[in-house]
Amino acid sequence: MIKLKVKKGDEVVIITGKYKGKKGKVLKVFPEENTVVVSGVNLVKKHTKPNKMSEGGIITQESPIHISNIAHIDPKTGNPTKVAFKFLEDGSKVRVAKKSGEIIGKVGNNVKV
């Protein structure tokens, strides 16, 4: 299993495939499958049967995409970047954009800096 450097709410860009160049927010992360769901990317149509709670029909929803096909967006430059981990003076661990050194977010409590 790969250590995921992406969290829910991160801004990412698709780097390969049909949706190459599209930007979006991470809606959901599946660490077991190494996949993420990105808003507006990898849309599929799903046919649903009618039941007591909802009526049937065709709905469009996002499908998971492999993490190797995405890259973080550097908050300073807006370009794709790799992510590194760094410890601050107070001992907290943060995710940092490798290109600019800008802090992307803290590790552990999902709080944006």
From Swiss-Prot:
InterPro entries: KOW, Rib_uL2_dom2, Ribosomal_uL24, Ribosomal_uL24_CS, Ribosomal_uL24_KOW, Translation_prot_SH3-like_sf
GO molecular function, one term: structural constituent of ribosome
Gene Ontology terms describing biological process: translation
Entry superkingdom: Bacteria
Pfam families the UniProt entry points to: KOW, ribosomal_L24
UniProt keyword Ribonucleoprotein present: yes
Gene3D superfamilies: 2.30.30.30
Stretches of the chain forming a coiled coil according to its record: none
Alphabetical UniProt keywords: Ribonucleoprotein, Ribosomal protein, RNA-binding, rRNA-binding
GO terms for cellular component: ribonucleoprotein complex; ribosome
Function of the protein: One of two assembly initiator proteins, it binds directly to the 5'-end of the 23S rRNA, where it nucleates assembly of the 50S subunit. One of the proteins that surrounds the polypeptide exit tunnel on the outside of the subunit.
Subunit structure: Part of the 50S ribosomal subunit.
NCBIfam families according to UniProt: rplX_bact
Family according to the record: Belongs to the universal ribosomal protein uL24 family.
Protein name, UniProt field: Large ribosomal subunit protein uL24
Organism: Rickettsia prowazekii (strain Madrid E)
